[in-house]
Amino acid sequence: MSTLLSVRNLKKYFDTAHGTLHAVENVSFELEERTTLGVVGESGCGKSTLGRTILGLIEPTDGEVLFEGRNVAGLSKSERLPYRQKMQIIFQDPYSSLDPRMSVQSLIAEPLIIAGTYKDSTARNKRVQELMDTVGLASRFAYA
């Protein structure tokens, strides 16, 4: 497997009325293809800031994020769209992140519909099943 995401010495600081807040300090890791990563920690420890920085939603103070070998900081707005379509953050409050009234299949299909990548429902449903298989989610959960 090859490295899909490489985060090197990532830092994110915010200026506040009380001084500088070190939200993310020297975070480094590599994520291989076909793997997932969960970031766990106390409230306010920088998990969301880390995710937003990796996605390029906010600029890092220092360090670099390489996705498929390219530095995310050097991507133009149009180049960032395909990058963001390949990554997703699910924030810690599942009730605000995932609609409990939607099926698992619908939750997975929704971003594909919004992005317009699979307009044909048959192809979209096939892709949803592939994604479920990739993460080991049994078909019986598709409509749960």
Where are these regions (language model features)?
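ABC transporter nucleotide-binding domains
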Residues: 1-144
